[in-house]
Amino acid sequence: MLLPSDVARLVLGYLQQEKLSSTCRSFILESPNLREYAEHYTDEGSIPGCVLSLFGKNLTTILNEYIAMKAKENKEEIPVMVSALWKKLDHTLSQIRSMQNCLVLPTSQKVRTRYGIQDLRHQRMLTSHAASTGSAVALQQTSTPIAAKQVMLRSFTSQSASQTIVSPLCSGQSTIQCTNSPATESKGETLQNSALSDAEKKQTSSPMRRKTDCQRRRRAAPLNSSSATHEGETEGNVDSLQDLIDGNFPQLVIENAREKILSNKSLQEKLAENINKFLGSDTATQASKLSEGGALEQYTSIDEILGLQGGEMHMSEEAIHDILEQTELDPDFQELYDLFACSSTKPTKLASRDPSLQTEGVATTSIHVANDNLEPMESSFDASVDTSHSSNHSEVGAAQKKDGRSQLVVPSPTPKVTESTGMPSKVQEMPISASERQSMSDRSVESKKSIDSVIILDNTGSDTVIESNEEVQVTSMEVGISQSQDVDMNVLHTEVIGADCQLAVEQGSLNMLTVDLTVPNLKEETPKMQTYEKASEAKKSSPLKDEVQALGSRRLERNKSEGAEGPCTTESQNIVVLVSIGSTVTESNLLNQRGDLPATPRKTDTSTETTVSEQMQAESSITSKELKVLQKQASKTPPHPMVPPISPSIKGSSSDSDGSSLPLEVSSSVGVSTPVNTSNVEQNCSDVSSVDPSQIITLSFITEDIAEDAELTKAVKSISERSNSALLLSPFHKPQESSSIVSIPGPTSETLTLLADPREVVNVSGDVATGVKPAEDCTIISLPGASNLSTDGGIIQLMPATSSSFAPSGSFFISTCNTGGAQQSNIMVVPSNCAPASTQKQPCHFQTPPRPHSVYTVGQAISPKLSQGSTFILASAVQPVLPGVMGMFPVSVVGQSSNTFTTPSHQVLHVPVSQGVPKLSLPPKSQKPVPPRTLASAAEKQGTAATTDSGNRKSSSRMQRSENVDKNLAAMSQNKPEERQTSTTNPSTKGTENHKRVLCFENTAANRGTPNTKSLCNSAAPQNKDKVETMNTSSSSLPAKQNNKDSGKADKTAPSTEANSKCESVPSKQPVVPATKDLSGDKKPVAVASSPDVLGGVMANKENMLQKENKKQELPEVSKKSSTADGAAGNLERTVQAVHETGRKHATLPSILRRTKLSTERMCPPSPLTKQASDLLQSMQFNSPNAKHFSGGDLPIPRTPGSGIDDRLVDSHQDHMKTPKSKRYPEDGGTPKPMLPPATPELPACSPASETGSENSVNMAAHTLMILSRATLAKTDGSSPLKDNTQQIKLSKNSSKKRKLDEPDEYGRRPHKKELMSPSAILKRKKMKKHRKKSTDDFPAGMDVDKFLMSLHYDE
C-alpha cells in the first residue's frame, strides 16, 4: 500500500536530489503529508533523519524502471525474426564451408558417400593425425546409404565429403562405424562409411546412444539437426545437404511428428516439462522443436527450421540440445523418433534405429536392418555397408545391453553379417561389416537372440557410441585386416557374451565412459580404431587362425549366431578379446575420459591404447602395414587377444608393440596380458581362457567426470607412461599367476590390485588371499613385492564421482610400475575407510612394493618428499594429522620431533581399527609410523612386547601417551615403529588392538590393555580404572604414586612387571612399599571398582557384592590413592605390563592379568572389607604422605600447582580412592572436593570421547595432557628423577599425611564421578589448574610445554 506520505517523501527526495532547495522548503511547508518534517528541515530543505526513498529506490530509479517495463511491453518481435535469419545465414554459411571441404558435391547421396569415403581414405593415407581426427568425423559421416544424406548434417565436422561433417559426436553415435568401415574396406572404401550422419546414427542408436550423440555433437561443431530429417529424406528426397540449405525438411515427417505431439497430451506435457526444465519458453514452440528434435539429427537446423517456422529463435543451442537430450531419454517419445527414422530412412534405417532404440526388439530390428541394409548396401555398397553396419552395430550393442553386458558388441554383429554374407572369414570380419552387418542383422537376429539382450544393453548405454567410435577408427585404419578382425571380434564378442558377463558389464561401464570420451577422443579414435583393428586382427588371427582354420568361415558364422554361447574356450576367450577390442577403443576412450591416463590407457590400459596413440600417428599412415603386422602378431599371440577380451582396455594388447604396456584391466579384471612377449601373450591367452569368471573383478570406472579431472589424468598419465603395470584384479598377489595373465612379469608382480571396495580384500586368486592376510577388520591392498620389480609401484586412486574429497570407500587404487624407483617412497598409507578412526571399522593392510629408500623426510609445510610420479598417497578418509603431511603420514608415523622416519623397504601396513578410542586410533598403524607417543615411548622402553600392549593402551590411555610422549616419544617412537610394525603385522596384534586400553571408565580391561582383563580381573580392571581416574584427578600425585604402585603392582603381577619396574629404576625400588599398597589397594580397589560410586563404569567383582557403603567409601579412597599411585605408575606399569606381556607373548598377558586378579582377590578375601579398608587407609596414610610429598615436593608431578592444593587433591584423591573414612569425610569434605573436581574433570577431557567434542573438551584435554606429560617427565626424567620422586614421596608422605587423611574423607563422602562429570567440577578443575599454574612446583623443571601441546594436538 503506497501512502501519500510515501509519495511525498519520494518527491521530496527527488527535489533534494536535484538540489532545488527553495522548492524543497516550500514543499515541506505546504505539503500536508510532510508536516512532521516542517520543524526539522534545514535551510537546504533536507531533513536529517528522513529516508526519502521507497524500498531503497528513489523516484528517478522507480520512473526509469517503469519506463523500461513499458518499453518492453510495446517492443515488437522483430529481433526474434532477425536473430532467426542471422542464425539461418550462419548455418548456411557453415554448410557451404563444409561443402567446400568436399572435392565435389555430387547430387547423388551415394556418389557423395563414395567420394567422401575415397576422400577419407586418401586423407588417412596422407596424414595420420588428420586422419585420426578428421577421418573419425568422416567415418561418422560415412553412414549407411540412408545415412549418406545425414553426412550433410555433419557439415561442420566432415573432413571428407560435407556429409562426413559428423563430428566426434559420431563416435559417440550408436552406429558402430568401425564395423561399417570394415565393410567399406572390403569394398576398398574407407571408413567414411562408418561415419553416419547424426540422424542416421541416432536412428540406429538407442535413445541413450542418441543422448550421448547429442552431447558429442554439442561438443563438436553444431550438428545439423536436419540430419535426422535428411535421413528420412534419404529414401527419395533431395540431398540432405541441399535440403538443409534450402530449409526443406521432409514435411511429412515433421507434420506427422507434430500431429503426434499435438494429439498426445502427455507428450505435450512432457515436452513442456523438458523445455521448462532448461528454460521457460513457449511449450508450443518447444514442442515443434522437439518434434523435429525428435530426430535428434536436426541440431543446427533445429533452430533454423523451428525458429523460422515457430519464430522461437531465442532459445540457445545448448538449451535446445538439452531439451532434445531429455526427450531422447523419454521412452514416450520413442514413437516420434521412430517416425523420423521410418519416414526419413528406408526400412534399413528404421530397423537399425529400432534395435538401438528398442532394446527388446533388437533381434527383429536386426533382421529388418539386415534386409534393409542389404538393399542400400547393394545399391551403394559403401553407404549401405556403413548404414547396415551402423544399424547392425547398434543392434548388436542393443542386444549386448540386453544381456547387461555393456560390452562393445558392435564387432559381433559384424561377424554375424559376415556369416550371412558368406564372405571369407577375414573378409567377413571387416569387409562384411556393411553386408555383414546386414546379414549379421539377420544373423544377429538368430545369434543375437542369445546376444540380443547384451546388444540391447549396449544400445541403452553409451556403449553404442563407443562402439561406433571404435569401429569408425578401425574401419579406416584396418582396411584389409579389419575384415578378419571384425569377424573374429564378432565371434569373440558373441562368445564373450556367453562366457564373460563380468567383462560385458565392465565393458558397459567402459562404454559409458566412452560415450563421454567419444567427442574428445575423436583424435584418439583413429588410434583407437587402429588399435581396434589391431586387436581385431589379433583376435582374427588367433581365432581366425585357430577357428577359421578349424571351423573356417562356417565357424565364424556359427560363432556369430551360436558363438555368443562360446562355442569353444579359445573362441570365447578370443571373443572376450574381441569384445574388449570392440570396446577397446571405447575403453581407451573410457580411460581417457576417465582420466585414468589418457596416454596411459593407450599404453598401459591396453596395448590397444598404446597402439592407439602410437598407431594414431604411425598407424594412420601405415594402417595397412600395421594391420597386417598386427594380424601377424595376433597370429603369433592368439592367446593375447584372449587377454584383451578380459580387459577391454587391453584391446591394444593384441599388438605386441604395446607389449611393454600392461593393459590396465579396468573393465575386466580377468587377466591383462601385456604383449611384451608373443609367447607370453599366448600363455596369457591360455591363462585368460582358464581364468575363472569368478576371478574376474569388474572394476568399472564409470566416472564421467574423471576425464575432466586434469590432475588425475596427469597423474595417471605420468605413472602409466613411466612403465605400464597391469591392474590385475585376481592375481595381484601371485606374481606368477599375474605374469601368466600379464606378459610382463615385473609390472605384473607390481600390479596393484584394484579393490572395488577398499574394505574388501580381493581374493580373486587363492594366492591373493595367502599373500596378504586381511586383518579381521582390514582391507588389504597388496602390491606384490616381487623382487623382480625394479621400480616402485605408483598408486593411483580413482575415485568414483562423489562429493567427498577424500577417498571414498568405493575408490579404486591403481598401482603402476614406475621407473626411477630409487626416488620413490615406500610408504603407501591408504586407509581403506574415509570415516574417522572412531568409525573406522576395518583396519587396512597395504603392502607396498619393495622400494629402494626406507627413510622418508617430511617437510614442514610440504608433503613427504616422494619421487614424483612414484607413489600417490591418497588422502585418507581421516583428515591429515600433520598440516604438511597431506594426511598421508599420521603424526604417529612421522613422530612429533623428527622430520624423517624410516620405513622398511617392503612392508604391509596394517591399519588397525581403533574400537575403543576413535581419536587415538592412529590412521594406519603403519609399520613405519612412529607409535603413538606415549605408547611408543612406554612400549619402546618396555621392549618390542610393548607394541602389542601399546596397541591396547593406545586407545585406552591417551593420558599415558601424553605423559610418555615428551621424552619417550622421540627415542621410543624411533625404536617403536619397528616394534609396532611387528605388532601390526602379527595377527595377535589385532587381538590386542581390539582390546585397547581406553581411559573411558566403561572399559575395565582397557587400562590393562589385555583382552582378558575385563572378564578375568574385575579387581585388576577396577584398579586400572582407578589408576586412570587417579591420573585424571590428581596427575601430580599420579607420577609418584603411579611409579610406586606400578612397581608394586608390576612386582605382584609378574616377574615381567618387575622387569618393567626395573626398567623404571625408581619403580623397582619403590615396589616394596607400593607392593603393600597394591595389595591393600588392589584388594580394595577391586571393591572400589565394584562400588558404583567410585568406579561407576567398572562393574564387577565378587567384591561388588561385599561392598558396604563404608567399605565402598574406604575402598574408593584407597583405590583412588592406589590408582593415583597406579595412575601415574599405571602408565609405566601399563607400559611395563604391555612390554612384559608382549615379551611374554599374548598367552602370558592373560596370565599376568590373572595374577593381578588373583592377587587383588586374595588381598580382598583374606580380610573383611572393613579390615581391608582400615589397612588400606593406614597404608594410604603411609603412602599418602609420600604421595603428598611427591605431589607437593616433586616438581615432576604435573598436578601439584600449589603444593598444598595439589597435595590435597592428590591426598584426597588417593584417600578417596583407597579408603575414605566416614570420620574423615567431614574433615576433608571442604578442601578435597574442589581439588578433586578439577582433577576429575580432566579425566573426561583425557578420554578420547570427551575430547572429540568442543573447544572445552580440547582445552581440558590439553590440560590433562599437560599434567600427564609433567608426570611422565617426572617419571621419564630418568631413573634419578624417579629415585628423587621416591625420596620426595617419603618426605611428602609425612607432610601430606594429614591433608590426605582429611581429604580422603571428604572425597569418600562426595561422589567423585558426579563432581567430575558436573560442570561445577569442570569449573573447579579450571580453578585448580589456575592454582597449579600459579604454584612453582606446578611445572617439572625438565618439562617442555610446547612438546606436550604438540602431542596434545596430535591426540585431538
Curated annotation (Swiss-Prot):
Residues 638-647 have a biased composition (Pro residues). Residues 1323-1334 have a biased composition (Basic residues). Belongs to the NPAT family. One of its GO terms (molecular function) is transcription coregulator activity. Residues 180-242, 379-446, 589-688, 916-1092, 1107-1130, 1180-1258, 1276-1342 are annotated as: Disordered. This is Protein NPAT. Required for progression through the G1 and S phases of the cell cycle and for S phase entry. Activates transcription of the histone H2A, histone H2B, histone H3 and histone H4 genes. It is found in: Nucleus. It holds the Pfam family NPAT_C. PANTHER family: PROTEIN NPAT. The LisH domain is required for the activation of histone gene transcription. Residues 180-196, 381-394, 607-624, 666-688, 944-959, 982-991, 1004-1022, 1030-1042, 1054-1063, 1249-1258, 1277-1289 have a biased composition (Polar residues). It comes from Xenopus laevis. Residues 648-664, 917-928 have a biased composition (Low complexity). Residues 3-35 form the LisH domain. It comes from the Eukaryota.
